[in-house]
Amino acid sequence: MCPCMYCRLLHYYSLSEEQIAAQREAATLEDSFAWCGWHNDHGALTGLVQAMFTDSAGATVPNPDPAAGLYVKNRRGQILKANIPPGHLVYQIGESSQILSGGELQATPHAVRGPQVTGVNRETLAVFMQPLPEEPMAVPTGEGAKDPQEAGKTENLPKGVPPLLSRWNNDMNYDEFTQATFKAYY
């Protein structure tokens, strides 16, 4: 299922005073993610390492705000900070795994919250694993086959995350699913 992989070095630019103020004034924690808003990865798995923080000169600095970093939303609707220990690799489930497992696995909604200070960047590495473009995005057939996003499983999606069923159908391949996903987000 995951013969296609690529890595990205992700750089999150320092927040402006305006972005910090908007993040601080957000009505809820769910609305306070200025570095990267809520989304699901549409691939199969995403491997992540602990982020590092840098100043404007590129020197490594400690995280200046313990509330800054990666957050996930679990199936019960709880927003949790994902603290990745040094030297560890963690994985997030993507929507392709959700589809190809018939909903047994569920994609992990996640976002990145910036610090409440200017002049600090965030750096991390993500390893994205995904099907080949022509891979069928069909649920398993046979006994136990079911809808990958049953009723009630969308109730805890964060604002801005389009429901899977609004972008996917059982006749698509991975490339078609990718295009529909990009169109829904952008």
Positions of PLM-derived features:
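C-terminal flanking tails of non-heme Fe-dependent oxygenases
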Residues: 1-186
